[in-house]
Amino acid sequence: GKKNPSSSNLSELLKAFTNPNSASKFKEKFIVNIRNQWMPISTKDIACFSKEVLNYIYLLNGERYMIDFVTLEEVEELLDPKQFYRANRQYIINIEAIQTVKPVENSKLIIKLKEPNQKLEIDMSRLKSPEFKKWMDR
């Protein structure tokens, strides 16, 4: 006979084991690899995720690390939508990292991050503006 039930039980068990605190369904840590060492980074310390030629996370303290993920969609699924917002194709930002949001004439918004990430200016379509404002104003 087929052994599917037991393998699905195993995966359930594994899920429970790898996430003992099932109350939080969002990812609490990301692992970065630095010089062949692994380092756990708390999700709340991440200012933004960026998809460039390589993928990076910028921390609130200004550090930047390469991180393994295929798409930002896949990262978005793991994050608390109250905490993180998908600004555009390239960035997901932490509400705690936002310094200012400035509408510019060619129908977009420029999001400036707090020190020490102030060099990061993130463009967002003006179409997202009402939703984004509502997201920030809580």
Residue ranges, per PLM feature:
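Conserved binding/recognition cores within well-folded domains
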Residues: K2-K119
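C-terminal output/interaction extensions
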Residues: I122, P130-R138
